[in-house]
Amino acid sequence: MSNLFEPISLGKSTIKNRFFLAPLTNTQSYADGRLSDDEYQWLTMRAKGGFAMTMTCAAHVQAVGQGFPGQLGIFSDDHLEGLTRLASGIKAENSLSIVQLHHAGMRTPGELINDRPVCPSDHSETGSRGLSTKEVEQLAEDFITAAQRAEAAGFEGVELHGAHGYILCQFLSPTINQRSDQYGGSLENRSRILMDIIAGIRERCSPDFVLGVRLSPERFDVKLAEILELSQQLMSAGSIDFLDMSLWNVFKEPAEEEFQGRSLASYFTELDRGATKLGFAGSIRTPAEAQQCLDLNVDFVMLGRAAILHHDFPDQMKNDPQFQPIKNPVSADHLRLEGLGEAFINYMSSWKGFVKD
């Protein structure tokens, strides 16, 4: 049985355990993307509570890529002061500091940017316009520049958000991506922007800068077979340090009928990962489930809701393996004690059954 409290290496970094904080929308930043005190408190409390890696929420790399109100920004040097403070605060608690780089693409609410959202191709359902080839190249450049900005702020790595139907995921979709240039058509072409971003970060950031990718294996108009192929390619190339698979439920079967009869997770754990570390996110809410996830033969577990309810989930489990987390719904006062600001509490109130009325 693997031990959740064994150290793990990510590239040239060694971290203290297998608990990673999932990147969680919290709507606590200022309207211009600058860090707020509430977001600083939310993240540094998790670092102090024993998470070996503390990852920010999705931080948008272009102003037009904002996905939700109160989103952390990393598209301007105006964000550096707050990002530097945050990186320092996380590292002070002996937690690896990671920014998730993001662009919402067609999922950008038009009213947030006062413009039409963008997409790999024109998308009538959302009213999004397709990017020109030059704009795709600029998008890749802005992801790379954001990684450099994260490193300049003192962060130890970044994760590329290629999941949940956001823009990198939109490029991977054979349905949404209808381009006829080098960024559309074959899986090789549809994943080209992701590969270009990875190559650019590796070229311009330091050799010990940690780089990961988050992918969705299903939903969002992607195909499991293609995500498996891409995952193997990423791990075989050795160009990323970790792969974060967002499964929604780590114990579920695949949605696609031809793959059913075994767990979705098993398709990824049987891949040859080389030196790349593999982790899962999805409905891991108790110490037993965290251990069961690790026992699927993954290297780390990503906690989301469990980390909202208990900032010190890893430390509590370390001190008491029988620790039982509080059950939902919880009071707003409980969430305040756990370091959530009012904007985050209001956001969580929109999740059915999470916060008491």
Residue spans of the language-model regions?
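Flavin-dependent oxidoreductase catalytic cores
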Residues: 1-357
